[in-house]
Amino acid sequence: MSDGTGTKGALLIVNIVLWLLQIALGAYFLYSAYMLFFEPGMVNKFNDIGFGQWLRYVTGVLETAGAIGLLIPGLSGLAALGLALVMVGASATEIFILANGDATLPLILLLASVVVAIFRRGDITRFVSRLSPGR
């Protein structure tokens, strides 16, 4: 018979791995947001995209908010979901709009964000249930 120690240990390991992934994603998205705001080459890239510089700033703000949200218990699942949506847009832009686009990194970040969102889906459902108190 098992006393549940193995299951608790496995859950602890999964939780630690998720936190490490969230920290890594948060650090990358903060770096990416910094580049969006301050790297002159990003101005040219967003000119090539054709939607104007406002999209660069919106993307930077979303990435900053998502990076911070990844590190806040209770918001990490929602932040990961939001960042996954940003990476869907980034991947589509790299594939369909930019002439020499490379969607490899956005797709990797999309996958990692989806993994966090799936494993932290309890955060998402708790957040949604708070929005609809009548249920």
Task: Give residue spans per PLM region.
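Membrane-interface extramembranous regions
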Residues: 2-135
